[in-house]
Protein backbone atom coordinates (compact mmCIF):
# COMPACT_ATOMS: atom_id res chain seq x y z
CA UNK A 1 0.00 0.00 0.00
CA UNK A 2 1.38 3.39 -1.01
CA UNK A 3 2.29 5.91 1.65
CA UNK A 4 -0.14 8.82 1.93
CA UNK A 5 0.79 12.49 1.77
CA UNK A 6 -1.54 15.39 2.48
CA UNK A 7 -0.55 18.52 0.53
CA UNK A 8 -2.02 21.74 1.84
CA UNK A 9 -1.38 25.11 0.20
CA UNK A 10 -3.82 27.94 -0.51
CA UNK A 11 -2.21 28.43 -3.94
CA UNK A 12 -3.82 25.73 -6.12
CA UNK A 13 -0.93 25.87 -8.59
CA UNK A 14 1.64 25.04 -5.91
CA UNK A 15 -0.59 22.45 -4.24
CA UNK A 16 -1.20 20.69 -7.56
CA UNK A 17 2.49 20.84 -8.50
CA UNK A 18 3.45 19.16 -5.21
CA UNK A 19 0.60 16.64 -5.40
CA UNK A 20 1.45 15.67 -8.96
CA UNK A 21 5.22 15.37 -8.37
CA UNK A 22 4.66 13.10 -5.36
CA UNK A 23 1.99 11.05 -7.15
CA UNK A 24 4.43 10.56 -10.05
CA UNK A 25 6.85 9.07 -7.50
CA UNK A 26 4.17 6.57 -6.44
CA UNK A 27 2.85 8.21 -3.27
CA UNK A 28 -0.89 8.44 -2.65
CA UNK A 29 -1.60 12.17 -2.44
CA UNK A 30 -4.45 14.34 -1.22
CA UNK A 31 -4.58 18.06 -1.95
CA UNK A 32 -6.32 20.81 0.01
CA UNK A 33 -6.38 24.52 -0.73
CA UNK A 34 -8.60 25.60 2.16
CA UNK A 35 -7.87 24.97 5.81
CA UNK A 36 -11.44 24.63 7.07
CA UNK A 37 -11.48 20.84 6.67
CA UNK A 38 -7.81 20.24 7.51
CA UNK A 39 -8.42 18.38 10.74
CA UNK A 40 -11.15 16.23 9.17
CA UNK A 41 -8.82 15.38 6.27
CA UNK A 42 -6.06 14.30 8.67
CA UNK A 43 -8.47 12.01 10.52
CA UNK A 44 -10.04 10.67 7.34
CA UNK A 45 -6.91 10.01 5.25
CA UNK A 46 -4.43 9.26 8.06
CA UNK A 47 -1.46 10.58 6.08
CA UNK A 48 2.10 9.42 6.65
CA UNK A 49 3.35 12.97 5.98
CA UNK A 50 1.88 16.46 5.64
CA UNK A 51 3.23 19.26 3.45
CA UNK A 52 1.78 22.39 5.02
CA UNK A 53 1.77 26.03 3.99
CA UNK A 54 1.86 28.38 6.99
CA UNK A 55 -0.05 31.27 5.49
CA UNK A 56 -3.52 29.87 4.83
CA UNK A 57 -6.90 31.56 4.62
CA UNK A 58 -9.10 30.67 7.64
CA UNK A 59 -6.80 28.72 9.95
CA UNK A 60 -3.13 29.30 9.37
CA UNK A 61 -0.54 26.53 9.60
CA UNK A 62 0.19 27.30 13.24
CA UNK A 63 -3.44 26.69 14.19
CA UNK A 64 -3.48 23.43 12.27
CA UNK A 65 -0.32 22.25 14.01
CA UNK A 66 -1.87 23.04 17.40
CA UNK A 67 -4.97 21.00 16.52
CA UNK A 68 -2.82 18.03 15.58
CA UNK A 69 -0.73 18.36 18.73
CA UNK A 70 -3.84 18.48 20.95
CA UNK A 71 -5.07 15.21 19.45
CA UNK A 72 -1.64 13.60 19.81
CA UNK A 73 -1.10 12.96 16.10
CA UNK A 74 2.47 11.90 15.45
CA UNK A 75 2.53 12.73 11.75
CA UNK A 76 5.71 14.34 10.43
CA UNK A 77 5.13 17.74 8.84
CA UNK A 78 7.18 19.64 6.29
CA UNK A 79 6.30 23.33 6.38
CA UNK A 80 6.50 24.82 2.88
CA UNK A 81 6.29 28.59 3.20
CA UNK A 82 7.17 31.99 1.81
CA UNK A 83 7.14 33.33 5.39
CA UNK A 84 10.83 34.09 5.83
CA UNK A 85 10.62 34.46 9.63
CA UNK A 86 9.40 30.87 10.07
CA UNK A 87 12.88 29.87 11.26
CA UNK A 88 12.42 32.07 14.33
CA UNK A 89 9.58 29.76 15.40
CA UNK A 90 11.46 26.57 14.60
CA UNK A 91 11.56 25.22 18.17
CA UNK A 92 7.81 25.67 18.58
CA UNK A 93 7.22 24.03 15.21
CA UNK A 94 9.43 21.04 16.10
CA UNK A 95 7.34 20.41 19.23
CA UNK A 96 4.30 20.23 16.95
CA UNK A 97 5.83 17.65 14.61
CA UNK A 98 7.55 19.83 12.01
CA UNK A 99 10.63 18.02 10.77
CA UNK A 100 11.75 20.60 8.20
CA UNK A 101 10.95 24.10 6.99
CA UNK A 102 11.28 24.59 3.22
CA UNK A 103 11.14 28.10 1.84
CA UNK A 104 9.43 29.13 -1.38
CA UNK A 105 10.57 29.15 -4.07
CA UNK A 106 11.82 25.60 -3.62
CA UNK A 107 13.62 23.02 -5.74
CA UNK A 108 10.98 20.38 -6.48
CA UNK A 109 13.47 17.53 -6.92
CA UNK A 110 15.10 18.32 -3.57
CA UNK A 111 11.70 18.45 -1.88
CA UNK A 112 10.78 15.03 -3.28
CA UNK A 113 14.12 13.67 -2.00
CA UNK A 114 13.41 15.22 1.41
CA UNK A 115 10.04 13.44 1.51
CA UNK A 116 11.74 10.15 0.63
CA UNK A 117 14.36 10.68 3.36
CA UNK A 118 11.65 11.24 5.97
CA UNK A 119 9.10 8.53 5.16
CA UNK A 120 10.95 6.31 2.71
CA UNK A 121 9.73 5.37 -0.74
CA UNK A 122 6.06 5.18 -1.64
CA UNK A 123 5.87 1.51 -0.67
CA UNK A 124 8.00 1.94 2.44
CA UNK A 125 11.36 1.36 0.76
CA UNK A 126 14.20 3.75 1.46
CA UNK A 127 15.99 5.55 -1.36
Cite the ranges covered by each PLM segment.
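The feature encodes the CheY-like receiver
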Residues: 15, 57, 85
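Charged docking surfaces used in two-component/phosphorelay signaling
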Residues: 16-24
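Short hydrophobic/Thr-rich beta-strand motif most characteristic of the beta2 strand and flanking loop
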Residues: 26-33, 41
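Residue-level signal for the "D+5" position in two-component response regulator receiver
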Residues: 31, 58-59
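Active-site beta3 strand of CheY-like receiver
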Residues: 45-51
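Hydrophobic/aromatic residues positioned on beta-strands within the core alpha/beta folds
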Residues: 80-81
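C-terminal output helix
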Residues: 106-115
